[in-house]
Amino acid sequence: MVKNKNAVKGLLVLGGVGTAAFSVYTISKKYAKKLLYRHHKQEDRPSILEAKYSSKNITIKNDQDIQLRGILIPKENPQETVVILHPFGLQAKDMQLYVPYFEEHLPEAQILLVDACAHGQSDGYIRGFGIKDINDLVCWNNYLLDTYGKDHKILLYGKEQGANTILNAAGKHVLKNVKAIISDGAYTSPYDIIGYRLEADYKISKYPAISIIARHIKKAVHIDLKENTAKYVRHNDIPTLYFHAKEDEFVPLKMVYPLYNKNRGKKVLFVLKDEKYLYELVENDDFKQTLSQFIKKYMK
């Protein structure tokens, strides 16, 4: 009788474990779909970009014939362009507060803010995680050179996933006439940052959830979340300024060090001690001077 009771208890425990495991699996698959797919396209609302900077929309097609939207702040006879790439889940217009800083440092340059595939007003419903977005960045790169000439200078600025897209592309040597890169808050890999956010945002242990999420996304669209940007920057020969806020609330500071240390080419690392964003910098901030010197050196 005692053995039977113990057997029943054992089955109940196993049943509980099985239910918990099933729950983690189900939640992880739902989260994977939430990350992977855009379920509706946001309305394109007016912003300061049109009102203050007389911006205009431009569109191109990527290699999969998906239409991509960019917002261009034009200049007369431009010799250089700053391209701004946004983080995961945001859109080009969310980066409008960064425009004044590039206007200040490169007043003659036009500025192109890009909506990633499946973000903002770009078409598509499958997100690229900074991996499939590489080819789209190449399309924008080619568009600028085809439109303004092969000697047109380009500076790339990316925030979080935007930064990873740029660094990955630079390491693959698929970019042309890019004179400098500014990487803001880049992470080591999608796998690492998603696992970190699971624990920080949802209080869920990243294992086995992140493994389930990664398997589902790889099976669905052949994107490997373990693609590590540190692997790519070993081959990056474009001058790169890495900066990261010490108190970054989304990407932990520790993730920038493997990228900086592995980067082969000319590089600068700057950790913001107080501010969290580029547009919060004050006039006498040390980083503002570092940024100015970096831009002048490589965009001259």
Residue ranges and their predicted role:
Residues 8-61:
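An N-terminal hydrophobic leader/cap segment in hydrolases
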Residues 99, 103-123:
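Conserved alpha/beta-hydrolase
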Residues 127-148:
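Alpha/beta-hydrolase active-site loop
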